[in-house]
Amino acid sequence: MALPRAMRPGGSHPNNFLFNTLPVIDNPVERQRAMAVFERESLRDAFEMLTPIAPSLKNAFLIFNEDGLLIHTSVGGEQVYIPIQTNNMESYSWKKAPPAVFLANVDGRRGLLDAFKAKTQTNVSKVVFEIENYSPSRILTQTVFSARDQTEEDTEMGSDAEGATQTVSSRLVKHEFNNYALMLPTRQPDVSMSLSKAQLNKILGVCKQAGDPITFQCLFDDTLQVRSGDRQVVFSVDYQHADNCGVESSSSLLEKMPMKTKKSAPEPIRGISGRRLFTLVLDEDTNFKQLIQKLKLKNAGAVLNFFLDPDSIPMIGLSTKQPFSVMMFFMCSYPTQPCQVGFSPAAFSSTPMGAGVKRRASEEEESDQPPKKLFPDGKLFKSNFVLLMDKTGAKIPCPEQPMHF
């Protein structure tokens, strides 16, 4: 294939001449388009977040733009997005250009994210990503600086004394990936809640059986109920500092109810924005619990985002907190059967909110038996303050469809 122009004397590399783009500039300063540096604290944060999922990063995508770096990968069959903002790096520079996408896998054995594996953590001191050339033919050069002990062979070649520490570097080169599309929700979540690590663990504790559906339900009495099989956990939600809360609070009614418990109520979930009633069921093939456990969160909590509209594709998003966010999205559906509405019965029981419902061994059903389904009978609706008797004492038939408010 002929080059678009003749090579100059001295022999520039053929890759320096590209169809439909400008040739690479000889000046290295002008040729550089972006640079990201991980060192000291930013490097430790990257290790902390990426090491647990390192086996899933071989075929990850790295997307650079003016906001920083986004890592897109698949963990346990679920899509995971890790945005690393510019303030989470030691330094970052970007010249205006379309986002640059690179596949982490270099040659089947090595990858651009191998530097963040646990086995290299003690040796790596600095990781630099440098992007050169013009879109759509940019080149990424990764340089990893690490320390190693001097050997007898190094001493014979004139290096420092044997046993001293020497800084070495290794490089990987990767060309831009041009056939890539990234899909992320562009709308704001309808409801957002902030959870601590302990509260998130209580939710994971409910998800015992892999085949049991997981249901998230937000009720009138400002509670979030999570159910799976015959287990459930109920949290109170504090909307005091939430934005755009359009539902009148019923906390005053709850304060008047006697709470027969000697234990203090656990810390409530903090509502960030939105305040709506909903019931969402995670899709059956969702690896919700397995994915969160694989991330090995330490003391950081998470933010639950509920995307309720449009009705055809509701989702639940979960974003971890410090050192930087890891985002994941789970497809959901609205229940087809009428479900419980109104107040949570657990709000008036002696069991504190945020605590799982404990059952005696004699009350436990056999593990191979499906949990009992709730039907819209009188008992169900009476427990939720729905009037079922008229003034003459005649019983009013229960509605067959869910009640919408």
UniProtKB/Swiss-Prot annotation:
Record region (Disordered): 354-376
GO MF terms, alphabetically ordered: DNA binding
Cell compartments where the protein resides: Host nucleus
UniProt xrefs under SUPFAM superfamilies: DNA clamp
GO biological-process terms attached to the record: DNA replication; positive regulation of DNA-directed DNA polymerase activity
Protein name listed in UniProt: DNA polymerase processivity factor
Signal peptide (UniProt feature, chain positions): none
Motif (Bipartite nuclear localization signal): 358-373
